[in-house]
Amino acid sequence: MKKQSTMIACALAVVSGVLLCLGGCNQSPEVVIYSNADEESRLAMQDALDRAGFSGQYIFSSFSTSELGGKIMAEGSNIEADVITASTYYLESAQQAHRMFAPLSFTFHALEKTPGFCAPLTAQEGAIFINTRALQENGLPRPASLKDLASPAYKGFISIPNIRSSSTAWLMVQALVSAYGEQEAGCLLHGMMENAGPHLENSGSGPLKKVRAGEVAIAFGLRHQAVADRKAGLPIDYVDPAEGNFMLTESVCVTDKGAGGNPLAMKMAETLVRTARPGILKVYPVPLYEGENFREDARSSNVKAFPNR
């Protein structure tokens, strides 16, 4: 009797295993997505994926820009993520070092030439922010360039992002190096950091928060944020610096995991490119693809790209 019970238990276990396999063997594991996107962009991406029927089939993990960039460079093709959205310059550097991304299998029509392994999702330009009220109250001249911000006249009145932790700061540094060369750019950056003092911010959004609050009169940040603030009636204006508005793009790519890769990863990347863009454009209104509407104030007239990105 005991032997018969054991046999029945074994048979039930086998049947359960077969049923489990029938129910789940054809299901792919969840796609792991790593991203440095801010909350608004992340929500637009997740909404696009969910509307495309991928709800519950992915894990979305958020990182800071520097944290994700370091992770990509350190882990290479051993990274857990199946899909990555990050600053394009990190992705290009990682691809050059590790050859870790698969060619995208879907077509898209970007306005600018792109490498075959990634497609742009967002674009941000750098600009100088001004709190017009604070500028007037402190009798400060309106700056026309980034170079102006190194003047002692602005000591204690500016806030800038820290190049060690913020990709927004990279836009500022690119403009300085392109216009003045590395040596003079270094001196100017030092002067700007001295002027910022305790208002040197690790987060790219930190300077915007300080200029909004009137803690400083001038800041450097992402242009579209100042445009939105001015439209909302805040005492915020922006200056397109004489050195030019450098642009930072963030792109999506798929990790090349060979035959063991998740087949849904490429489909999700395509969904982000095709259906997440309308939501992203509400936050980052710079057009990246053919057919996208161009708002007059969405892009400066002096957009530049660093030649050795």
List each model region and its residues.
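Paired acidic/hydrophobic, glycine-rich loop segments that form the ligand-binding mouth/hinge
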Residues: 80-85, 200, 217-222, 237-238
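Periplasmic-binding protein-like
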Residues: 110-113, 124, 156-164, 188-194, 198-201, 271-292, ...
